[in-house]
Structures are given as C-alpha cells and as structure tokens.
Amino acid sequence: QATKNKQTTNPKKETSAYTFQGGAEIPRLKNKQKEQVIKHEGYAVSYNSDYKIANWVAYELTSKEATSKKNEGPYGGEFDEVVEDYTRSGYDRGHMAPAGDMKWSAKAMRESFYLSNICPQKPGLNRGIWKDLEEQARLWAKENGSLLIVTGPVITDDLKRLGKNRVGIPKTFYKVICTITN
C-alpha cells in the first residue's frame, strides 16, 4: 500500500524517478507533461490535470489484501463534477487501481473511486480483458505474496476528449506487474 510503502524522493535521482520503499522506481514524466503525485491509503497516482486522468497509478497488492472479503462502496470523491461526462457517453469509468484490490480497507476502497484513479474505457475492454487481468493479478498475489503494480493510460497529444470537462480518452492502457521478493 502507499501508506506502508511511503513514496520518497531519492535525492540523487530527484530529476529522474520516484522511488518507493524497497527501491522500486517510476520514471518522472517529460517536462511538457503535467503531473501531480497524490498518495492515498492504497495507491499513489500521478494525476494529469490537462487530461483529467492518471498518468500512472502504482500500488502494492499482498496475498492478504488479495483474499480480503470486505466490500465497502461504491463511493464518490474528488473531481466528482467530471462524473457527468461519463453518463451516456458509451465509456465505462475504468479503475486503474481496481476497487477489488482495495477491499482490505474502507478508506482505500473509497479512495479507489476517486476520478483521479479513473480513465474512460470502452465497455468491452473494462468488462473483458482488463477485468480478467485484474483478477489474474489477485491470483498471482495469492500465489506469490506481494506484487507491485503500475498501471495507466498511454497518453498521446491527439487524445479525443469526453464531455464538458474534456476528459482525455486514451486508446491504449498498460499494466506492469512485478513480484516483490526480499
């Protein structure tokens, strides 16, 4: 979790990467891209205010968290004015850090519904292969212990926009899943 693995900036690499506990690094974005890094209980997000979507979301998923049965939600949160942009748009609100990975904490679950953790996704992707990949990651966490997951949209200069708030609509997404070993 972002609270257990507090994000720190490595002074020697301050211009090149965000360093998380355990040494995992996420490269900083090019200067032309906007980013505000926000730490939540269950994940950290690099939020792009121009496109109103995440640049990336990173979190740890442990075997204990992957087997949690608690289910709190759904919730609203920051940037809720953007929700109406999704209504009848033909796009799902695709979670980057899925609510299903945050069942271990009511606060983490609530924060997973923040729109800074959401990107427009076509229903076939969100309810299909993306959901399958989220479920597979939970299985891997149960089998292997802890995973570090970094996920997000591929942001290009030609993104189409959604609604009056002009939310960026990514064409493609990525999810990097790494096993954490001591």
Label every model-predicted segment.
Residues 1-182:
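Domain-level detector for secreted/extracellular nuclease and nuclease-toxin modules, and
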